[in-house]
Amino acid sequence: MMAQQEKVVYPRYAVIRLRGIPTTPRDIAVTLDLLRLRRKFTMVVVKGSPSVMGMIQKVNDWVTWGEIDADTLAEVLRKRGRIVGDKPLTLEYLQKWGWHSFEEIALAYVAGEIDSLSCGKKMRIKEGERPPCIPYLKPFFRLHPPRGGLNSVKLHFSVGGDLGYRGPLINDLIRRML
């Protein structure tokens, strides 16, 4: 008899596209499309599984990324969350599906209790039953350009630019872009 494997909880990362569309190499464009980063200043929140980390490393010169905290994620959901039909994500909509607040679902996602923030049409959910996600939430967030501007979209964060890994400092950038 096989022993049950423990569920691996991967860290949650916010990935923001900072560079535009012209002259994007085809393989980079395909990877950005798989990550659902189709426009400049869009953000996705992903779990740091090995396959996703490989995609992020491939597009490292086009995006910035780092660990998102629950407070920032709750604020993003409140201000920039959209459901299908381009309607804003509201507290009433969350309560309809059994979530009590934006903070509750953000904490559950960052802690690894739920695997995904959004679930689409394929997942069958009965109304009143609490789903492990937000039904029909768009899987990306459209942000404003950052207040105060960017340093450089040609240099990495470690050398004074804005691209690449920035760790928990991504939360400061996200707050400037809300």
UniProtKB/Swiss-Prot annotation:
Which keywords has UniProt assigned to this entry? Ribonucleoprotein, Ribosomal protein
Q: Which InterPro entries match?
A: Ribo_uL30_ferredoxin-like_sf, Ribosomal_uL30, Ribosomal_uL30_arc, Ribosomal_uL30_euk_arc, Ribosomal_uL30_ferredoxin-like
Q: What would be one Pfam family of this protein?
A: Ribosomal_L30
Q: Entry's SUPFAM superfamilies? A: Ribosomal protein L30p/L7e
Task: State whether keyword Endoplasmic reticulum applies.
Answer: no
Q: Which domain of life is it from?
A: Archaea
Q: How does it assemble?
A: Part of the 50S ribosomal subunit.
Could you say which protein family the record assigns here? Belongs to the universal ribosomal protein uL30 family.
Name of this chain's protein? Large ribosomal subunit protein uL30
Taxonomic classification? Archaea, Thermoproteota, Thermoprotei, Thermoproteales, Thermoproteaceae
Gene symbol of the encoding locus: rpl30
